């Protein structure tokens, strides 16, 4: 009787483990799609912020921070860390929106978070944690809006890399 109970316990444990593994694998394509969408929408907002910054030249460092977070989100996307890519791209969009407002512009409709993107939760990282992640990845990073003002922002979107809309 003891051996039978042990066998059932082992089978039950294995089924729980395998269910967790397969549910995570099934969620990957969905997370990839969501991350792609978030990064693409943020790229639109970043381009609008870039345009507004060139017009009014009100430098706060937020534009450079936004570009750095978006580039980090792109790298995370390429590594398959889709959840991290979403969080960093959302942070980039919030910063880009602040740049637009600081430079007396109207944010585009893509600046608003959709219901899908605005998923709150206790396990979401704070802005400080996201900033720390960014600095841990690149400790020599400097945030200068002036340097980026005339730069081409061709590395903030995922469309050039992968077209999986």
Regions found by a protein language model. Give the residues of each.
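Well-ordered, non-transmembrane segments within structured domains
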Residues: 2-3, 20, 85
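Bacterial N-terminal signal peptides that target proteins for export
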Residues: 2-12
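Short, intrinsically disordered, low-complexity terminal segments
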Residues: 6, 23-24
